């Protein structure tokens, strides 16, 4: 039986949708099937956007790649030793059933500090309500933060509100600080990746035209190789 060091609650694009296909080839990691994607296949796919090689992509997606293409609802956490994964799954399914599926707004490319992501063109209160509910009701499943985990969040650079959220809920960018996004690259240096992303943005309808409804939430787990893969998904009502 596989062991997972951390768990996360995500939105993931529907399997075989144009957006899921894009994320799979962009990162070279398929979290829904837990497998790496051959670089030759990636280049063949990305040619449709005018991207001819992976050099500018791969050096900027190494960190984001391990998490798979997703939108975070609850960021990765270690499971409290007093609870089992089955209990976590059952509670997550219970919460999912309390929410009705809803519409996404249109997506656009945005630079946020030193990373790039797809974001909706306006705040979606439905996603915020879902994330907040998940954070509150699944908080007991989270192991207490260690000093090392707190230090990783650079507390001296956080606002007072973000610091309070970190200590109360385990992560600074949730609850009132939550902003749904689907990361494309993080820790970006230089502007070469931006030029590749502009090619994606000019053709974004190819990958975004099928994504209308937010209708499922996913539980991902961090495997022994440090890659996050899908473990289960639950439909909204």
Q: What residues fall within each predicted segment?
A:
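Basic, often amphipathic N-terminal segments
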Residues: 1-112, 125-211, 224-237
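Generic recognition of long tandem-repeat/solenoid scaffolds
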Residues: 116-120
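Surface loops and adjacent helix of pleckstrin homology
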Residues: 121, 222
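Small/polar glycine-rich anion-binding or flexible loop at a beta-alpha turn
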Residues: 213-221
